């Protein structure tokens, strides 16, 4: 009996020790909450984010709603991250307003928030004054990316020996938001600068349109009537309207040289055509989604390590018929 009592006492003591031992801390985590998840763009962002986490010993989770209208769903994702004791930082791009409470909670819990891609909806309208948890933005520098298009397109025009005073370049700007303005201005400023260095004065006409069906086709037609010799398109939406017109009216547009922005199936088909059946798409700039994901997580980690942080602008990647498949394999260029 005494032996049994002794055994029971030992078991009770062991149980007490186990109960008093604090739960083992889980893996330190950075939660990435995007505007989507399944699209190739977001998958490339995810790959970059996970890689940055692995390099620094952090687990990276990645979530996004199935559509950009599911604000409540995305709010739940943010709330779940905030309630997870292992989450040390959040990387966030919101699809609408309604995140006031979540951002305030992040501030109060001292969880830094990195904005990425388009950042917080409506330029951070949900941030409460004095309770801002955001530490920086990682996104495409649209002006820099527009300038990258200009540098490469100008080099092509110069190599083809087609540049003369008064050479006509049209620009189809996709809307009047900062994105459209910066992509157009970056291109125009840089290509004028390069031309001036060669003592050439270009004639540039800007067609500024909204994202309404048919408007980009009208802009294309207007630039053709004006006598455009080259045309720059500021996003995938413009390309998706222009390409079918260029294919259907080969003779009307065959002599015009094109350059663009973003990715997508139409740009892939057009650029791979190489001018064989319709006007030539010389090249375009893709947003470097992999690097956006990578640098976003790196920024969060730097803050957690007590380092000074600042916004990171990503310039994009120029692609042509020659390197488009390589960028596709690296998840920089995406279809869809």
PLM region spans:
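Short, solvent-exposed amphipathic alpha-helices that sit
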Residues: 41-56, 145-149, 179-199, 241
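Hydrophobic alpha-helical segments within soluble ligand-binding/sensing domains
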Residues: 74, 136-167, 215-216, 263-268, ...
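Hydrophobic alpha-helical
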Residues: 79, 89-113, 187, 208-270
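Flexible loop/hinge segments that line or gate small-molecule binding clefts
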Residues: 102-144, 264-278
